[in-house]
Amino acid sequence: MAVTYEKTFEIEIINELSESVYNRVLNYVLNHELDTKNTRLLEVNLLNQLEVAQEVDLFQQPFEELQAIHEYWRSMNQYSKQILTKEKVA
């Protein structure tokens, strides 16, 4: 599978976004001293899901799949902002 500039650029964007989203949720969990073993907590489940999603080998994915993965991380970015903000207000 050939690696093109466009593919490498897309992978770099995905990596930056995924790290940002994951770190936002991780910081929330740590700052609120949530039990990371308690899978009843939405934030902990989200953190676990994001951790698994980061394990995908992006260089093995076709460009079309990278675009879908990028959209997943955009959605998780918006979702994590919404739920973590709601938690702060509540």
From Swiss-Prot:
Disulfide linkages recorded for this protein, renumbered to the chain, are none
Keywords, in A-Z order: Plasmid, Toxin-antitoxin system
* Superkingdom of the organism of origin: Bacteria
Q: Does the keyword tRNA-binding apply?
A: no
Q: Which GO terms describe its molecular function?
A: toxic substance binding
Please, one GO biological process term?
Answer: response to toxic substance
Check the record and name the Gene3D superfamilies matching this protein. Answer: 1.10.8.130
Spell out the Pfam families in the cross-references: Epsilon_antitox
TM region positions: none
Query: Quaternary structure per UniProt?
Result: In the presence of the zeta toxin, forms an inactive PezA(2)PezT(2) heterotetramer.
Q: Return the similarity comment.
A: Belongs to the epsilon antitoxin family.
* Function (record text): Antitoxin component of a type II toxin-antitoxin (TA) system. Neutralizes the toxic effect of cognate zeta toxin. Part of a postsegregational killing (PSK) system involved in the killing of plasmid-free cells. Continuous synthesis of the epsilon antitoxin is required to counteract the zeta toxin.
Q: Which protein are we looking at?
A: Antitoxin epsilon
